Amino acid sequence: LKNAGVAPKDLEVIISCGVARDVEEPATAYIIQEKLGAYNAYCFDLANACNGFISAMDVLDSFIASGRCELGLVAVGDILSQYVTWNTSSKRDLHLSSMSYTFGDGGGAAILQRIKNGDEGGIRARWFLSDGSYWRVAVIPLIDSDRRYFKSNAANIEAAALEHVPGGVETVMKALNWDINDIALIIPHQVSAQIIENLFYKRLGMPQEKIYWSFPDHGNVGAASMPVALCAALAEGKLTPGDKVLLVGGSGGFGAGVIGLVI
């Protein structure tokens, strides 16, 4: 809010979009509203695994485009460490738990508001895909017991990403008439070095310097991965107003999403 020059009272919508929740009911967005004192805001949660942030941005952007609101907040705070177990009884259990061993805890937020006439900033294009045939590949069970831990098949997640994400990146770049030289940074979901290498470097042929990689510092912080990386890139001076950015998400489900935006 401070960076955007926005007062809490001016927020019209608050969307909380994390994997983790503070309570089952009510929506975490109400807790955020109370802590901010943003009592003019319509509050709700949006759950879409690690794609929560870009999905919430898409929804809020649609609210603004339709005239429902002028200004809103997308916020995520994920404590993924609670879904990690080191108590594995077999090689299979270890394999299914292995992706959780890079989980971190983190949070981020973004303000979206209607652009002024002549301003070319904001979301310029988006693409989303859902393939429910992969839903069993990455799961946190809805049970209150010592079995409520993240389990996944890393090879199947990578296969889904390689199957679906390249087409989304190409679709958004074509829609915007961007080539790789136009893009300042590509900010992917920070999931694993192997997926980044196979997807962006080998399949899409992207140069390494175009991929912003915060994984070594923060690990996989779920739906917070992209806002954390975006904020870090801004703080490091790697992005400035007017720069073109691709946000590229992949999540359990399997879900894929790409947003082309101008800072």
Predicted regions and their residues:
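Conserved active-site "lid/cap" helical segment
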Residues: 1-12, 97, 140-184, 195-204, ...
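Short coil/turn connectors at secondary-structure junctions
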Residues: 8-12, 38-42, 66-72, 97-98, ...
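Short beta-strand segments
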Residues: 17, 47, 72-78, 112, ...
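Short glycine-enriched loops at secondary-structure junctions
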Residues: 19-22, 78, 129-132, 191-192
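Condensing-enzyme catalytic core mediating Claisen C-C bond formation in acyl metabolism
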Residues: 88-159, 163, 250, 262-263
